[in-house]
């Protein structure tokens, strides 16, 4: 069935197809039409960050930026759904076109630029939660916010989403917000990580709820840079690291007509880079912090490879676009078979 839907969707502009598919999915969920078409979710409970995940396969941030569709997406068998990236204020993102399919390479290039309706909208949407799995909320800074004031944006988002989230993901690795990736290094990183942890402690005290925090990192770092980020996360007692975001490299797509497009590349072309980062993190941290593996998971075997490299959980995005809901159960079954 998805093969037919994909043929239709891939005949449309990528962003139009994205919006149409989510609108249809949301309508089907509201009318209670999804269940007959969805396989029984794979049950393979795993505890990570102090949370019990129904299975190890989650939906990565970026698909449901405003939490308008997470209840429907949650019915497709995911053990977790991560919504966002959301910023304090609404922003339109970058000019269109800003989303490109690399069909032969099973990749996607996006330069969306954190287009979202703002954190107030997201919190109102999450208040209508019916999804029973783990809900992550991915937060970022507004484009207009200077790097030196980035912490303030993350704090504003944390204040807003803290009581609604099962975990919070800190996005400092999108290539589509100018200067954002600079937050991954040196004093910028130390200042941000310490400030976010202070805010977490204050919110924990105020609410009585402990919400774990994961940090999402880029694949375009040297091994030494990866280890430096890992050391900073461990020393500041973060609960998890998400590896990885999209890549700015085009080494894996030398013949694509879209290779010159600016933006982050995801899907199969980033798989090897992502797995390498996971392996470096796992070998360096020696179990000090769980790793959530994301990047180029197109088959169950790809999910298994991420787990074998050192990830405790995995997330899908581009693979879900190319393969549809069948990939969720395929990946979850492959990971469950490792137990």
UniProtKB/Swiss-Prot annotation:
<dbReference type="InterPro" id="IPR005719">
    <property type="entry name" value="Dihydroorotate_DH_2"/>
</dbReference>
<feature type="active site" description="Nucleophile">
    <location>
        <position position="174"/>
    </location>
</feature>
<comment type="similarity">
    <text>Belongs to the dihydroorotate dehydrogenase family. Type 2 subfamily.</text>
</comment>
<dbReference type="GO" id="GO:0006207">
    <property type="term" value="P:'de novo' pyrimidine nucleobase biosynthetic process"/>
</dbReference>
<dbReference type="GO" id="GO:0044205">
    <property type="term" value="P:'de novo' UMP biosynthetic process"/>
</dbReference>
<dbReference type="InterPro" id="IPR013785">
    <property type="entry name" value="Aldolase_TIM"/>
</dbReference>
<feature type="binding site">
    <location>
        <position position="171"/>
    </location>
    <ligand>
        <name>substrate</name>
    </ligand>
</feature>
<feature type="binding site">
    <location>
        <position position="244"/>
    </location>
    <ligand>
        <name>FMN</name>
    </ligand>
</feature>
<dbReference type="InterPro" id="IPR005720">
    <property type="entry name" value="Dihydroorotate_DH_cat"/>
</dbReference>
<dbReference type="GO" id="GO:0005886">
    <property type="term" value="C:plasma membrane"/>
</dbReference>
<feature type="binding site">
    <location>
        <begin position="317"/>
        <end position="318"/>
    </location>
    <ligand>
        <name>FMN</name>
    </ligand>
</feature>
<feature type="binding site">
    <location>
        <begin position="110"/>
        <end position="114"/>
    </location>
    <ligand>
        <name>substrate</name>
    </ligand>
</feature>
<feature type="binding site">
    <location>
        <begin position="61"/>
        <end position="65"/>
    </location>
    <ligand>
        <name>FMN</name>
    </ligand>
</feature>
<feature type="binding site">
    <location>
        <position position="65"/>
    </location>
    <ligand>
        <name>substrate</name>
    </ligand>
</feature>
<comment type="function">
    <text>Catalyzes the conversion of dihydroorotate to orotate with quinone as electron acceptor.</text>
</comment>
<feature type="binding site">
    <location>
        <position position="171"/>
    </location>
    <ligand>
        <name>FMN</name>
    </ligand>
</feature>
<feature type="binding site">
    <location>
        <position position="296"/>
    </location>
    <ligand>
        <name>FMN</name>
    </ligand>
</feature>
<feature type="binding site">
    <location>
        <position position="176"/>
    </location>
    <ligand>
        <name>substrate</name>
    </ligand>
</feature>
<protein>
    <recommendedName>
        <fullName>Dihydroorotate dehydrogenase (quinone)</fullName>
        <ecNumber>1.3.5.2</ecNumber>
    </recommendedName>
</protein>
<keyword id="KW-0288">FMN</keyword>
<keyword id="KW-0285">Flavoprotein</keyword>
<dbReference type="GO" id="GO:0106430">
    <property type="term" value="F:dihydroorotate dehydrogenase (quinone) activity"/>
</dbReference>
<feature type="binding site">
    <location>
        <position position="138"/>
    </location>
    <ligand>
        <name>FMN</name>
    </ligand>
</feature>
<feature type="binding site">
    <location>
        <position position="267"/>
    </location>
    <ligand>
        <name>FMN</name>
    </ligand>
</feature>
<dbReference type="InterPro" id="IPR001295">
    <property type="entry name" value="Dihydroorotate_DH_CS"/>
</dbReference>
<dbReference type="InterPro" id="IPR050074">
    <property type="entry name" value="DHO_dehydrogenase"/>
</dbReference>
<dbReference type="GO" id="GO:0005737">
    <property type="term" value="C:cytoplasm"/>
</dbReference>
<dbReference type="InterPro" id="IPR012135">
    <property type="entry name" value="Dihydroorotate_DH_1_2"/>
</dbReference>
<keyword id="KW-0665">Pyrimidine biosynthesis</keyword>
<keyword id="KW-1003">Cell membrane</keyword>
<comment type="subunit">
    <text>Monomer.</text>
</comment>
<keyword id="KW-0472">Membrane</keyword>
<keyword id="KW-0560">Oxidoreductase</keyword>
<feature type="binding site">
    <location>
        <position position="85"/>
    </location>
    <ligand>
        <name>FMN</name>
    </ligand>
</feature>
<dbReference type="Pfam" id="PF01180">
    <property type="entry name" value="DHO_dh"/>
</dbReference>
<comment type="pathway">
    <text>Pyrimidine metabolism; UMP biosynthesis via de novo pathway; orotate from (S)-dihydroorotate (quinone route): step 1/1.</text>
</comment>
<feature type="binding site">
    <location>
        <position position="216"/>
    </location>
    <ligand>
        <name>FMN</name>
    </ligand>
</feature>
<feature type="binding site">
    <location>
        <begin position="245"/>
        <end position="246"/>
    </location>
    <ligand>
        <name>substrate</name>
    </ligand>
</feature>
